[in-house]
């Protein structure tokens, strides 16, 4: 990456209270190079310009630390990780996080295997599968301190895919856009059914841009009923 983009990454991360060393920067540079290389073979991201990737992918992912819920050595699952956002940037900065990245695309999982090998990332598991299936598996169900998702699905749908992974007293953090009030209003039934409650909604302004988004911080207050998550067609046809 050019010096300007590196400076944006370093200074932008400081706004989240993150102080990057050069080895962190080198990891982000390798990640960016792999993203560009593999994006020519498959659809990973429409955002490829260097400074845009720094702002809209790297700094956006790192904004999760503003939730106050990122703690070293805790177990985190990234549901629908895509090209690895937000969990790969978080693992670069917090290498002791025990991370699981879940995606339904085998091609994207293959890309992520290359990323973690080239970056030498440890304590990370990649799963090719669907959240509604893996969320029923006792190996993963209610096993995580934290789940995160940057997916574009409405919050009430995301909750059914993500909360079954979270331990009681753990958290789900949804990275959502500027307009969030209606989504929250439409999620009250899902929160009640899935045993979650909104603890806080934090407004985040991305550095070097006019982009505003929100972190919706949801606490798991009890065990999810075993009937959730339902099959994908049921979730889409009649969301909670």
Swiss-Prot record:
GO CC term, one of those recorded: cytosol
Cystine bridges: none
Top-rank taxon: Bacteria
Keywords, alphabetical: Cytoplasm, Methyltransferase, rRNA processing, S-adenosyl-L-methionine, Transferase
Subcellular locations according to the entry: Cytoplasm
Enzyme class: transferase
InterPro entries tied to this protein: rRNA_ssu_MeTfrase_G (IPR003682), SAM-dependent_MTases_sf (IPR029063)
Ranges annotated as spanning the membrane: none
Main location: cytoplasm
Residues that bind S-adenosyl-L-methionine: 80, 85, 103-105, 131-132, 150
One example GO MF annotation: rRNA (guanine-N7-)-methyltransferase activity
Keyword Metal-binding (UniProt): no
EC number: 2.1.1.-
HAMAP family given in the database record: 16SrRNA_methyltr_G
Family: Belongs to the methyltransferase superfamily. RNA methyltransferase RsmG family.
Described function: Specifically methylates the N7 position of a guanine in 16S rRNA.
Name of this protein: Ribosomal RNA small subunit methyltransferase G
